[in-house]
């Protein structure tokens, strides 16, 4: 996921590729990033850039997040540094316990279509200002669609993305309520209309239960 995000960001207008540093644990992954765009700052095992980064996106396995933060993100850093985790199952409370209360923290749930700027990304934040919220939304919005939600809704949002379930597209399939689970009905069409973001409307329409006895 980290590589997909870096590749997507390198092709949008928010950042210059040379201002994006991608840290890998394996040299083979570093070579892949360099092959995609030599201007990206791809390194292997060098975390020194985290001390000066304005935005840090953590895209590692969930069980690695705590150690990474404690080892590389608890020292000197710029004021207003934003930390974004895209690791599944990591809560804002955990991030705050490991990283501290004095920085903006976010959990984001993108999908791999982010590489081609067609992701639907759900985001929740803590200790953040409105300006920081707008910045993070702009970043992920440049990579598809982005929506700021309450943390309790990240689970349902993940299920929607994982199973490609878009019942709000078909009024009546849920008894006429116009929603699937606890996600707000408002914006459901915007979240679900693009096949490149994993949607399969025709298949879902066939699977949706019929109403009205037809």
What is each of the regions a protein language model found here?
Residues 27, 36-37, 45-123:
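Rossmann-like NAD(P)(H) cofactor-binding subdomain of soluble oxidoreductases
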Residues 1-45, 118-119, 176-182:
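NAD(P)+-binding Rossmann beta1-loop-alpha1 motif at the extreme N-terminus of oxidoreductases
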Residues 201, 210-214:
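Extracellular beta-solenoid/beta-roll
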Residues 41-48, 147-149:
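Short acidic-hydrophobic, aromatic-tinged amphipathic segments that line or gate anion-handling sites
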Residues 94-104, 120-156, 167-206:
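Internal alpha-helical scaffold of NAD(P)-dependent oxidoreductase catalytic cores
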Residues 16-19, 79-81, 187:
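Short acidic capping loops at alpha-helix termini that bridge into adjacent secondary structure
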Residues 20, 30, 49-50, 185-191:
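Small-residue helix-packing motif on alpha-helices
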């Amino acid at each position: 996921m980290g590589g997909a995000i870096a590749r997507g960001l390198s092709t949008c207008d928010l950042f210059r590729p040379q201002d994006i540093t991608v840290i890998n644990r394996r040299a083979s992954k570093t070579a892949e990033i360099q092959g995609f765009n030599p201007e990206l700052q791809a390194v292997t095992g060098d975390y020194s850039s985290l001390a000066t980064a304005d935005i840090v996106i953590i895209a590692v396995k969930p069980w690695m997040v705590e150690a990474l933060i404690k080892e590389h993100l608890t020292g000197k850093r710029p004021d207003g540094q934003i930390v974004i985790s895209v690791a599944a199952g990591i809560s804002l409370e955990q991030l705050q316990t490991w990283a501290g209360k004095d920085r903006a923290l976010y959990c984001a749930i993108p999908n791999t279509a982010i590489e081609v700027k067609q992701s639907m990304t759900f985001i929740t934040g803590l200790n953040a200002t409105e300006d920081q919220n707008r910045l993070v939304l702009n970043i992920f919005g440049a990579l598809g669609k982005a929506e700021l939600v309450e943390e309790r809704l990240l689970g349902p949002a993940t299920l929607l993305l994982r199973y490609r379930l878009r019942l709000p597209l078909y009024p009546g399939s849920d008894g006429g309520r116009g929603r699937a689970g606890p996600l707000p009905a408002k914006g459901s069409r915007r979240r679900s209309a693009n096949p490149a973001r994993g949607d399969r409307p025709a298949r879902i329409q066939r699977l949706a239960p019929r109403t009205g006895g037809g």
